[in-house]
Structures are given as structure tokens and as C-alpha cells.
């Protein structure tokens, strides 16, 4: 029984790694894809960095809170690029009309999800890591100085991005390429409510409970507490983790239901450009 279980785990790992290798080869063979991973994070960081530098030299509060803009930009990019990296990898299969083949192969849906989660981290790392060093060189802002807090920020943001990316991929699978724009735009719907650049208290009182239902809100509040007050708030990270567990489970459940619906309606073989 144990040998059979080990064999099944090994087979599953091989299928996941094969899917990861496919997307790694796509990245490695296309310099425009690699350039796109770095271009927008760099533009955002430089633009907001210079704005933050200007404000910091002209306002007492922002002089005390220097770095919150750059920190918010870098953390937002983790959230946005994590979701986009997952969704783009999924769309690559749609564009190539390969999704039907994948769903009829021995690769299971949860293995497909795991492979796309890992490749989204690879995509994010290729784009975000160089930008963090540019932030040090241009503005003296060292994201890695957050220490263990950065690990908590990163994992919470990634779990949110995966949950949303998984669910959006299911919607695209079920509804076709007409829903493709969701992959590019859905995170911007959350941007005002997650309070990326300002405290939750800035929102109207009736919107604040909604903001606190979103895990990234806790991360950005935690970042501001760390930068401004020099205090790490583990309570915020635990709250975000609990919400992420619910959100991630809902995202996976929704994806599996949408896959079943797509199979029933025959939309798996109708995807593509």
C-alpha cells in the first residue's frame, strides 16, 4: 500500500514538473515575455518613488512615513503580478488551444493548479527581484530590511493572488475568451478597497468593514505600521492568513465546479484565439 502511494505521489510530481517545464521553456525562448515581466514593475517603482521623494521633502508627515509609497508599490506588485502570472500561464494554454488536451491527459486539475502556482512565483521573481534592487539603488529603500515580516507579507499576498487567479481562470474556461479581460483588470477592482496607499480610516465608515474582509488590507496596514511606527503586527498577519484560507478554498472549489461545467457544455474544446 505504501509503495503504491509513493508511486502515485511520484507520478503526480512528474506531471506537475512537466507542466512547469513547458511554461519555463515558453518564458526562456521569448525575450518579449521576459521584458514584460520587468518593464511595468520598474516603471511603477520609479514613478511612485520620485513622487514619494518629492512629498517627503515637503511634508512633515511623509518625511516621518518615508518609504510607504515605495513599499506599497512593491507589495502591490507582488499581489498584482502573482495573480497575473497565474492567469497568463493559463491563457497561454487557451491561446494555443492546448487546454482540452491537458484536461484529457493524466494531469489532474489540482496538479494543473499547483504547476501554475509555482510558475507564477517564477514569473514574479524574474520581474520583482530586480526591481527591489533598483529601489535600493535609486531611493535607498530596502524591502529586505523588513526581515521575517516580508515573509508574512509575501505569503499572504501570494495566497490572495492565487485564489483570485484560480477563480478567474475557471471563469475564462467556462465562458471563453470573452472573459479574458478579467485576468488583466480584476485586481484593480480591489485596489481602492485594499487601501494600498492610504490607511483604512481614510475610507467612508460604511466601506471600512468591506475593506477588512480582504486579506491584502491587513498586509498594507501591517506594512505602514512597520515603516511608520516600527512595529510588526502579527495579529494582522494571522487575520489575513485566516481570510486567505477561506478565499483560497473558495477559489479552488469554484474552479473545479467551473471545470465540470465546461466539460458538460463542451467549452473545453472551443477555447483559443
PLM-predicted stretches and their roles:
Residues 1-273:
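Hydrophobic transmembrane alpha-helices and immediately adjacent juxtamembrane helices
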Amino acid at each position: 500500500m505504501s509503495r503504491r502511494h509513493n508511486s502515485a505521489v511520484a507520478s503526480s510530481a512528474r506531471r506537475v514538473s512537466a507542466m512547469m517545464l513547458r511554461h519555463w521553456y515558453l518564458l526562456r525562448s521569448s525575450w518579449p515575455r521576459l521584458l514584460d515581466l520587468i518593464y511595468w514593475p520598474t516603471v511603477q517603482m520609479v514613478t511612485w518613488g520620485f513622487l514619494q521623494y518629492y512629498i517627503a521633502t515637503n511634508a512633515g508627515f511623509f518625511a516621518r512615513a518615508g518609504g510607504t509609497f515605495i513599499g506599497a508599490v512593491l507589495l502591490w506588485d507582488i499581489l498584482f503580478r502573482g495573480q497575473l502570472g497565474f492567469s497568463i500561464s493559463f491563457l497561454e494554454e487557451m491561446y494555443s488551444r492546448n487546454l482540452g488536451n491537458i484536461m484529457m491527459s493524466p494531469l489532474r486539475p489540482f496538479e494543473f493548479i499547483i504547476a501554475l502556482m509555482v510558475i507564477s512565483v517564477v514569473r514574479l521573481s524574474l520581474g520583482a527581484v530586480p526591481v527591489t534592487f533598483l529601489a535600493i539603488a535609486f531611493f535607498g529603500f530596502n524591502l529586505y530590511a523588513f526581515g521575517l515580516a516580508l515573509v508574512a507579507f509575501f505569503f499572504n499576498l501570494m495566497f490572495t493572488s492565487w485564489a483570485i487567479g484560480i477563480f478567474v481562470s475557471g471563469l475564462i474556461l467556462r465562458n471563453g475568451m470573452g472573459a479574458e479581460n478579467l485576468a488583466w483588470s480584476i485586481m484593480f477592482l480591489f485596489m481602492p478597497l485594499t487601501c494600498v496607499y492610504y490607511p483604512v480610516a481614510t475610507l467612508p465608515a460604511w466601506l471600512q468593514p468591506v475593506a477588512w474582509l480582504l486579506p491584502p488590507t491587513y498586509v498594507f496596514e501591517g506594512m505602514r505600521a512597520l515603516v511608520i511606527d516600527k512595529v510588526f503586527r502579527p495579529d494582522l498577519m494571522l487575520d489575513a492568513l485566516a481570510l486567505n484560507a477561506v478565499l483560497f478554498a473558495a477559489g479552488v472549489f469554484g474552479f473545479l465546479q467551473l471545470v465540470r461545467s465546461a466539460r458538460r457544455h463542451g467549452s473545453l474544446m472551443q477555447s483559443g484565439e
